[in-house]
């Protein structure tokens, strides 16, 4: 009996240890979901959209961007150019050490951020227009989930962004605020706008022209051994996920360079060092070169897909996942295939032929 009691005490102690571990980070889930993120206002002028077209032209077969910047008009915002707008304008000291936005971060020790994928729903009735008018992004954290063994936990954060034009009365209310307006006065107007656009039901589009879900994974601090391009030859080879279909719709290879990555970072107002600083990539993150942006992969897949759609067919919903890194100065091959009526599969392959990004698309006919 003495031995049995000893075993029971050990099991109980183990359970207490497990509960203590679970409670060490479990507070992040409700805390992050309760965060009130400030609305992000932007003017939907054609400039950023035009600059992206010009930046991608050398990488897209037969692309012909306009020779001049067009004035604002009722032209719909191209898919997926919403990525170029609605980024917060923070002073540099307010950014995290790696250059990222602190609003989504769990905090220490989860300082390493990776874009895991996302989804986008486009309104069939109220698309955003490049008419120069003021619009807003209402953003919230839908979920924050802790996964992994003790000491190896990761935080998966799902961020919802609802993009919508402002009403004339809302634009007037903001314009009437003096430069010295109090935080309370500003917050009241922002709360009214948030209340009009946000929905508790994440399937309800409401007045949003674009509903985006961004899935970000935060990893714990680690100091990986510095990595060089040659060092990868001696490293264990990861499992390669091969595509499960032929690219019957399109297949196109590009060689991304640092200029493309810089331009996309600039257009998206993204200071994340993994896209800009090769030394940071090698010594802090353990990557052999600059990382190709997850949203840039998404952009190429959407641009190439839309060039292959039938007349009147428009993208309505996209869901995608980033499975493995893509790198600057290494070829990336974008592929697409039909998957039934109004359905398509898109993916990106690395130099090893493995799938690094994959997505599914549903279209509608207008």
At which residue positions do the language-model features occur?
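Hydrophobic, proline/glycine-rich low-complexity stretches
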Residues: 4, 12-136, 315
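Catalytic strand-loop segment that frames the active site of acyl-thioester-processing enzymes
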Residues: 23-86, 207-292
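HotDog/MaoC-like acyl-thioester-processing domains
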Residues: 23-38, 116-256, 322-366
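Short, hydrophobic/amphipathic alpha-helical packing segments
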Residues: 49, 137-141, 298
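Terminal targeting signals and extreme-terminal segments of soluble enzymes
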Residues: 99-105, 129, 295, 300, ...
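Acidic/His-leaning functional-site neighborhoods
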Residues: 252-333, 337-345
């Amino acid at each position: 009996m003495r031995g049995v009691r000893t075993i029971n005490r050990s099991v109980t102690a183990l359970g207490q240890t497990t509960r203590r571990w679970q409670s060490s980070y479990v507070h992040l889930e409700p805390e992050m979901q309760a965060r009130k993120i400030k609305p992000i206002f932007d003017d939907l002028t054609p400039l950023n959209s035009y600059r992206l077209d010009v930046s991608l032209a050398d990488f897209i077969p037969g692309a012909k961007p306009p020779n001049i910047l067009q004035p604002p008009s009722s032209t719909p915002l191209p898919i997926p150019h919403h990525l170029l707008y609605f980024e917060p304008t923070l002073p540099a000291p307010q950014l995290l050490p790696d250059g990222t936005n602190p609003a989504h971060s769990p905090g220490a020790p989860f300082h390493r951020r990776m874009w895991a994928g996302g989804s986008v729903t486009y309104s069939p009735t109220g698309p955003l227009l490049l008419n120069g008018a003021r619009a807003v992004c209402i953003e919230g954290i839908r979920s924050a989930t802790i996964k992994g063994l003790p000491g190896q936990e990761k935080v998966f954060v799902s961020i919802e962004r609802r993009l919508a034009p402002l009403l004339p009365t809302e634009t007037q209310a903001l314009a009437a605020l003096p430069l010295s307006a109090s935080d309370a006065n500003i917050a009241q107007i922002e709360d009214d706008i948030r209340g009009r656009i946000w929905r508790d039901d994440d399937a309800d589009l409401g007045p949003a022209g674009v509903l985006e879900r961004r899935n970000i994974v935060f990893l714990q601090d680690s100091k990986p051994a510095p990595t060089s391009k040659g060092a990868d030859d001696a490293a264990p080879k990861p499992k390669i996920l091969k595509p499960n279909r032929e690219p019957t719709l399109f297949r196109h290879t590009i060689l991304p360079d640092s200029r493309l990555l810089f331009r996309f970072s600039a257009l998206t107002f993204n200071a994340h060092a993994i896209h800009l600083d090769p030394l940071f990539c090698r010594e802090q993150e353990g990557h052999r070169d600059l990382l190709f942006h997850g949203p840039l992969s998404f952009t190429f897949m959407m641009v190439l897909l839309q060039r292959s759609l039938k007349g009147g067919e428009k993208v309505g919903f996209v869901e995608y996942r980033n499975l493995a890194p893509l790198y600057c100065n290494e070829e990336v091959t974008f592929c697409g295939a039909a998957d039934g009526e109004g359905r398509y599969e898109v993916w990106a392959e690395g130099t090893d032929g493995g799938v690094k990004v994959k997505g599914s698309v549903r279209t509608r006919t207008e």
